[in-house]
Swiss-Prot record:
Entry protein name: DOMON domain-containing protein Y73F4A.2
Main location: secreted
PANTHER family xref list: DOMON DOMAIN-CONTAINING PROTEIN Y73F4A.2, PROTEIN CBG04168-RELATED
Domain of life from the UniProt record: Eukaryota
Provenance organism: Caenorhabditis elegans
């Protein structure tokens, strides 16, 4: 427990020491800032179980948005990029295609707290879209992972209109 608090505190301090934006809800705590043509983000889901997925999507069309998705399996977190719809499971970007990659600084899962935390750097030109302009960000609570396959998410993603350039 102390270890999880120490890691989360260090991550929060790193983001809090710069000008940041924040989204906070009952299930999420997300911090981000725009720098060097990237969005530096700490994404934390505070109610996710093993064998579930979560993520953040970008785009005004709820039936077609790109995103960064986090899978918790065997108490380990992996990250992938792709696209999805309001309730559908993500379709992942194929490796080797001409898409911008997400850089991962930290991935942590604390099963006793059901908390997943990730620190990622997302390029402003992401999967064929520009994240520079104001648009809706969609925070996907969770979906199940069954036999290695992601299922649809149970709840509609929470939305927030974000203008990442105005946070710096």
């Amino acid at each position: 427990m102390f270890r999880s608090i120490a890691v989360l505190s260090a991550l929060l301090f790193a983001f809090a020491s710069a000008k940041t934006c924040k989204y906070d809800s009952s299930d999420f705590e997300v911090y981000w800032r725009f720098a060097n043509n990237s969005i530096n983000m700490q994404f934390m889901n505070t109610d996710i179980k093993n064998n579930e997925w979560t993520g953040v999507g970008f785009g005004d069309d709820k039936n077609n948005f790109v995103g960064v998705f986090f899978m918790v399996s065997n108490n380990q977190v992996t990250v992938r990029t792709g696209s999805t719809t309001q309730h559908g499971p993500p379709t992942f970007t194929q490796s080797g295609t001409n898409t911008a990659s997400v850089s991962t600084q930290a991935l942590n899962y604390f099963p006793e707290d059901k908390t997943m935390s990730a620190v990622v750097q997302i390029p402003i030109q992401f999967n064929g879209r520009s994240l520079q302009s104001c648009q809706k960000w969609r925070f996907v609570k969770s979906g199940k992972i069954e036999n290695g396959q992601l299922t649809r998410n149970d709840k509609s993603p929470k939305e927030k209109k974000v203008c990442p350039m105005e946070c710096n």
